[in-house]
Amino acid sequence: MTVPESPPTSPSTSTPAPARATGSDVGRAAFVTASEIACVAGSLLGAGVFGGPPVAQSAGGALSAEATLLAPAGPAFAIWSVIYLGLAVYTVLQWLPGRLASPLHRRIGWWVGASMLLNAGWLLVVRAGWLPVSVAVILALALVLGVIVRRRAEAGPVPRADAIVVDGTVGLYVGWVSVATCANVTAWLVAAGVRPGPALAQAAAVLVLVVALAIGLVLLRVSHGNPAIALAMIWGIAWIAVGRLTGAPASAVTGVAAAVVATALVVAAVVAFARRPRHRLGGPVIG
């Protein structure tokens, strides 16, 4: 009878030795790095650094802070700086010793890279004025980020640094994109000539905000109460409230509804965070 071989162990422990990086792992990390470079270039293009108008002034201003009832006020977009910084840190983190073969990065790395390419692609199509295409791209981006959230939640234990970087960055990313998707779709419809009367427009805006709340609740559940998701959504929706209550287009109904939804997300986030297993944020943590 043949005795099964035991898995290799580390010299000082009886636990299996860490997996070794493969060519696929290196290729994945290189893909993420290339995607990060494309994402940075896209963000600079979107800001008008290479010439031409910034995103807010592209496509006839359809995505400006004053374009629709669901457009967040200008300061809301500062969150992109934090998200881009987090993506840069993730890109470096995945190359550190022991990370290339990490089960977590094997599960999410390709998806993170894809999200950065979609981000850059969205900026390009908006600059080109292709609003219908921008809707398709941002929906694909939201879907990819949702997959990352789920795969992170299903991952095994990960080092605390990885948990902080991944949960923080992806949480802010998916939370903000969820709000931005609502604004993007609304901007496309308005630009396409869908202009209902004031009462119907406000009712539709309130309905979309309720949908955003539902999305936030689902994401909180799937992510085991990742507070970064709620924080980004609260940030975006609160700035919608500010925009409607203090700027144009003015809408007290939409502004108050946005404030209520943001408050509801605060409560939901606190409850979800309090109920999460002590060892989890967006998934198990070790170290």
What function would you assign to each model-found segment?
Residues E36-V55:
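Alpha-helical transmembrane segments of multi-pass membrane proteins
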Residues A71-G74, P196-A214, A241-V266:
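Membrane-interface transmembrane-helix boundary segments in multi-pass integral membrane proteins
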Residues R20-A34, W80:
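N-terminal membrane topogenic signal
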Residues L63-I79, I164-Y173, V194-A204:
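Short aromatic-rich membrane-water interface segments that cap or initiate transmembrane helices
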Residues G121-V135, A192-A199, V218-S223, L245-A250:
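Membrane-interface helix caps and helix-loop-helix hairpins in membrane proteins
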Residues L96, R150-G156, A269-V285:
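Membrane-interface capping segments at transmembrane-helix boundaries
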